[in-house]
Swiss-Prot record:
This is Glutamate-1-semialdehyde 2,1-aminomutase. Its cofactor is pyridoxal 5'-phosphate. Homodimer. The modification N6-(pyridoxal phosphate)lysine is found at K270. Transmembrane segments: none annotated. It is found in: Cytoplasm. Its EC number is 5.4.3.8.
Length: 430
């Protein structure tokens, strides 16, 4: 029995399903999860000593690669002075200043510890600011596991939930909670316009992933985002961009810089923690002024602005501002996506791929999808076979057909070549 299997068997005795986040259980693809012992650069090693080229990157944060010396040094130096204080630090101010500098739509920012906290708090703030209850979200967009957002929420919920009904995607979420959440089709401008026409003056906020990464990678169209901005402005609703995944991942200023759109509030995470638990939400000063202790919208967190997370985040933000960083990252990611598509075509496999910044999506279907419905028509059985073949050849992809992939600054040409050679073998195997 492999060491991975031994650990999985042991884990299931004390951890529900043997994992602390459902997608890690390999339920979608089958087989035994890999228990990771260490990682460096673009590689990870499992408990059996197998090395993998990593295209998960801790689900996005590891944009400069695993265990980057400057990030490690920053954490070690901070840890020498204690791990947490429960009091303000100068580093928190520096982090806030850096975020506001790099993302101009953010005039003030509040640090939290997870993406779920960021989106949950941003929605509460939007409701408090507008005095309205109704929220619009979109099919396939995942904004964390807050109750009001678990409706057709993409990601692991595509694996575990019934997606045919406009109902909570998770047991334990009362229908009364989600009745204030309206779910619309991603990239459907007409449907969005109709919603605003029918509910004028009732909508507190629209929340959206500008590049959805939790129903695989699906880009928002320019027309969709433009309409969203115009409708929110006209109706007095708050536009929230969930950039937990895309922030500092698709461009230095996030997806909003790529698209040229200015939201009212932005949610960040992943990259800003450099692999540590950290997230943030911020935006217009007049909206943020409603947040406690200034205003009546309550939000708090014991570990918010944790010194170790802030240190890792600041070190990462410094590294990604190097000249040419994003040009090279985007080039390598596009090279990977195009190479995978070419390998599939040569093998006669229906397949498409897309890339933006350091994110990519692979789809076992003809054409790049533009909506949740199109994504769900992918050939998941074929993806599962491909996933295991790649794993056998030392390439670690996301263990779900409904997750985006991530490239780091450490994925050089030799690593891409090894990945594409593995892909050619995997496609040939069927």
């Amino acid at each position: 029995m492999s060491r991975n299997q031994q650990l999985f068997d042991r884990a299931q005795q004390t951890i529900p399903g043997g994992v602390n986040s459902p997608v890690r259980a390999f339920r979608s693809v089958g087989g035994t999860p890999r228990f990771i012992t260490r990682a460096e650069g673009a590689y990870m090693w499992d408990a059996d000593g197998q090395r993998y080229i990593d295209y998960i990157g801790s689900w996005g944060p590891m944009i400069v690669g695993h265990a980057h010396p400057e990030v490690v040094r920053a954490v070690q130096e901070t840890a020498a002075h204690s791990f947490s204080f429960g009091a303000p630090t100068e580093a928190e101010i520096t982090m806030a200043e850096e975020i506001c500098k790099l993302v101009p739509s953010i005039e003030q920012v509040r640090l939290v510890s997870s993406g779920t906290e960021a989106t949950m708090s941003a929605l509460r703030l939007a409701r408090g600011f507008t005095g309205r209850d109704l929220i619009i979200k979109f099919e396939g967009c995942y904004h964390g596991h807050a109750d009001s957002l678990l409706v057709k929420a993409g990601s692991g919920l595509l694996t575990f939930a019934d997606t045919t009904q406009n109902a909570p995607s998770s047991a334990g979420v009362p229908a009364d909670v989600t009745r204030h959440t309206m779910v619309l089709e991603y990239n459907n401008v007409e449907q969005l316009e109709q919603a605003f026409a029918r509910h004028a003056g009732e909508i507190a906020a629209v929340i959206v992933e500008p590049v959805a990464g939790n129903m695989n990678l699906v880009r928002a169209s320019d027309a969709f985002l433009k309409a969203m901005r115009e409708l929110c402005t006209r109706d007095g609703a708050v536009l929230i961009l969930d950039e937990v995944m895309t922030g500092f991942r698709v461009a230095l200023g996030g997806a909003q810089a790529h698209y040229g759109i200015r939201p009212d509030l932005t949610c960040l995470g992943k990259v800003i923690g450099g692999g540590m638990p950290a997230a943030a939400f911020g935006g217009r000063r007049d909206i943020m002024a409603r947040l406690a202790p200034l205003g009546g919208v309550y939000q708090a967190g014991t570990l918010s602005g944790n010194p170790l997370a802030v240190a890792a985040g600041l070190a990462t933000l410094k590294l990604i501002q190097a000249p040419g960083f994003y040009d090279r990252l985007a080039s390598q990611t596009r090279k990977l996506a195009d190479g995978l598509a070419e390998a599939a075509k040569a093998a006669g496999v229906p397949f498409a791929a897309d890339a933006i910044g350091g994110m990519f999506g692979i789809y076992f279907r003809e054409g790049v999808p533009g909506s949740f419905a199109e994504v769900t028509r992918s050939d998941t059985a074929r993806f599962n076979r491909f996933f295991h073949a790649m794993l056998d050849h030392g390439v670690y992809l996301a263990p779900s057909a409904f997750e985006a992939g991530f490239v780091s600054a450490q994925h050089d040409d030799a690593i891409l070549a090894a990945t594409l050679e593995a892909a050619r073998k995997a496609f040939a195997a069927g």
